[in-house]
C-alpha cells in the first residue's frame, strides 16, 4: 500500500477536529488507545502518523515581503515555510499583482505561498493530499484575513488528479505551481515519516517523479490551464530534477529558469516556468525558398512565427557566406520580438546555438545546458560545442549555424533568427562538417522541427507570465571551452590570440601576449 492510500484510512479511523482558541487554529486528535496497535517491532504507518500528531503544532512567522509577513500555525506533519517556500514565492511575485487572475498551487503545505499570493490579488485555489494541510491552510488564511479555496486532492502516481472535477470547477488557471516533493523513497530499515508527511515530501517511484506525473496529466482531456498560461515548478538538482526540463521540452513545452538558490553543501533549488511555445504565432513549411530569413523579413507575420524550407536556393550565414541545405536538413527562421535588438545581437546568436544543443539534448533525454552550465560537461559523449560567433560544432565538424538579421523601415523594426542544421551527412568543401545522424539516428526532421521550435521559444519568447530572459554567459562560455579545449587557436591578421572569456554582449575577450583585445567581428578571424 502506498503512502497516499493511508491518508483516507488515517482520517476515517482516527478523525481530527479543529477548534479555535484566542484566534489561533489548533489541530487535535481523539483520545487513542495506543496499546491496540500492532507491536512496535511491526512497522505500522497509522501508529507513526498518530505519534507524530501527538506533538503540539508550532507557530511560524514568515516574512514574504519586506516588513510584511504571515503568522502560520503548522501541525507536525505539514510542511512549514522554508528556503524553497521563499524562492517559489519570489518567482511568482515577479508576475505582479494578480488582479483577479487565477492560480492553482499543488501541495500547499501550511498555505504560506497561497496566502501570500492571495494578498497580492490572485484568485487562489490550492490543494494538498494531506488533509491536515488543508485544515491548516484554511485556518491560516482566515487568521491572516485572505480568501482562497482549499481542496483535499492533488495528483496520484498515475498522473490523475484526485478531486479533479472540483479543482476544474475553479479553473482554468493562468498559473499552476508546485514545490515538487523530492525526497527519495525510504529503503529497508531507514527511518520513516508518517504517511501524511510521506505523501507531501517523498518523490514517487512511478513515472520518473511527480514533475513528469504532472506533465502526463496535462496531456489528458482536462480543463485546468488557460491558453497562454504557465506552469511554475520548483525542484532540486538530483537526477530527476536535472532531467526535468529536458523531459518537458521533449513533450512540447518551452521552459525557462526563473531563479535558483545554491546551498553550501552543493544542493541547488531551481524554479522554472513551462508554457506552450508560440501559441499565437503561425508555422509555415515550404518546399523551396530563396532564404527563410529573407522570406520573414518581407512578410508581416506575428512574433514567434516560424517558416521552414526543404530547400534553400540562397541560404546565407555570417557575412553573407553561402549556407547549403541538403535534402533532409533543417532550415528554419523565426520572427523575434524587435525590442530584443536593444540587447546584444552577438549574445543572441550564441544563445541560439544553446537552443540547437538544447534541442539535441531533449531528443536524447539528457540534461539541458540552458538548465545549468554544469550540464555542459556531459556533452563530451557527443562532442558538441559552440564556436564563436554563431556556429555549433561536433567532433568531426560544423553541425549548425545561426544568424540574426534585422530590417528598419521608418520607425518599424523587424528581427528574425535563422538556424540551419545538418541532419544528414554534410559534404561542404569550405570547412569540416558533420550531420546530426552522425551522432544519433533517433531524430527525424519532423521531430527535430518541433524540438528546435520549443528550444527557440525557451530562449527568446516573451510574455507577461514568462520569466525574463536569463543571462547565459556561463553556459555559452562552458560550451565554447568545449571547442577551445581541442587545441584550436585563433588568428587575426596573422597574429595568434588566446581567447580568455566572452563579454556580457557576446564579444570575444582575447590576449595577444601584450595586451587584451575585445573582438566583436569575425572578419579576418581564422580558427586553426
Predicted regions and their residues:
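Mobile active-site "lid"/loop adjacent to the S-adenosyl-L-methionine
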Residues: 178-214
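Conserved Class I SAM-dependent methyltransferase catalytic core
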Residues: 212-263
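N-terminal lobe of the biotin/lipoate ligase/transferase fold
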Residues: 254-351, 355, 361
